[in-house]
Amino acid sequence: EVLAKVGQANPGLLAHDMRKAARAREVLREIPIKDLVEMMKKAGDLYLNATLPLGDGVQSPDDFARQQSASTGLPEHMCKFNMEKNHFVLNHMDQILDALTRGLDISILERGFGVEDRGVPISYQAQSPVLGMVLPSNSPGVHTLWMPVIPMQIGLILKPGPQEPWTPYRMFAAFTEAGVPKEAIGIYPGGGEMGAETVSRCGRVMIFGST
């Protein structure tokens, strides 16, 4: 049974697009972090409950769980459990950012500098306009690790695992439906060469497995 036909990106496409990587951060910096956090909450509800665009068709939540199960071998009930986990993270993004930054005033991240409660000047500067993610095929749960990136006003370059393109595409549909600019996220399906190109081109990367 054919579940989907996924067009493959090539390294040259990513090399071309990375010339405009700064645009991903620029469009996100035009939106206050508190508004991006609210978009994450809306996106979480859409991801869990809505029928969303996928390619030239649409995908319901049940379609998603069934297709992910078929391509990864993960039982459907585990696929739905991971959906609920992703939804939980998106719906508690304000608390997660507070924990990750140890209670830092979010306006300091927006400006890049500020003063701590104890009166110490601090500065945070982005080291890359985008974070590259080389994602696995067999562990959909790792997607929670990149969800805080967009509300921190950093763009995403996603290289999906060959057997698990479902989550990146559904998340992209939910994010953009919730108001996140499309320029902030790029998805580049492909083989090992695309994973290597993602690592090579992005200033900051998280990688899982060999592809």
Where are these regions (language model features)?
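N-terminal Rossmann-like NAD(P)+-binding subdomain of aldehyde/semialdehyde dehydrogenases
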Residues: E1-D117
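Rossmann-like NAD(P) dinucleotide-binding subdomain of oxidoreductase/dehydrogenase enzymes
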Residues: L104-T211
